[in-house]
Design a protein with these regions (language model features):
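Basic/polar N-terminal segments that are highly enriched at the extreme N-terminus
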Residues: 1-10, 15
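Short N-terminal binding/cap micro-motifs at the start of the first secondary-structure element
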Residues: 18-23, 50-51
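Glycine-rich beta-strand-centered segment in the early N-terminal region that forms part
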Residues: 30-46, 60-130
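Cytochrome P450 core scaffold surrounding the K-helix E-X-X-R motif
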Residues: 51-57, 132
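Short, P/G- and charge-enriched loop/turn segments at secondary-structure junctions
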Residues: 88-94, 137-143, 149
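Short, Lys/Arg- and Gly-enriched loop/turn segments at beta-strand edges
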Residues: 128-138
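A structural motif shared across PLP-dependent enzymes of the aminotransferase-like
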Residues: 129-131, 144-152
């Protein structure tokens, strides 16, 4: 049975590139509303993926040339937010990370069959998306868009 969806949720915000000090635990984040073709998932479990760490430390920025073990704890000084996501689009802060998740669909947007509400789902964290002139770029949950380190 699906309970009423609250207006606010708990989430972990990534406030910038760097070490773990850039992560902020918050309980005042608005619950997202699904748009057309989207679903809202109540997160049951979320795992830490290397994408979450690499996004936090800024390793995807084209200016970073060192290995991840060089800046893995504190991040990289040469990060450029303009290209620091998996796909190379500008990084937007704050960002809710969390590339891997499973949960239950609790709401659907326009064009999605309402019978999906209540279904358990495992989220594919990497989607193909058109970015600039590259038609098959990787769009990653928790990097290009908010992810699963939240209740919804």
């Amino acid at each position: 049975m699906i309970k009423e969806i609250p207006e606010k949720m708990t989430a972990v915000y990534l406030t910038g590139h760097g070490g773990i000090e850039t992560l902020e635990y918050r309980d005042d984040i608005p619950v997202p509303v699904p748009g057309a073709g989207e679903v809202l998932i109540k997160v049951s479990a979320a795992g830490v993926n290397n994408t979450d760490i690499n996004t936090r430390i800024g390793w995807y920025s084209k200016k970073v040339v060192d290995a991840t073990n060089t800046g893995g704890a504190e991040g990289f000084a040469e990060v450029d937010d303009a290209d620091a996501t998996w796909s190379g689009v500008a990084m937007q802060f704050p960002r809710i990370q969390g590339a891997d998740c499973c949960g239950i669909i609790v709401a659907v947007g326009e064009g999605v069959d309402e019978s999906r509400v209540g279904q358990r789902v495992l989220v594919r964290n990497m989607l193909r998306s058109y970015v600039d002139y590259r038609p098959y770029e990787c769009w990653t949950l928790g990097s290009e868009c908010d992810g699963a380190f939240a209740q919804y």
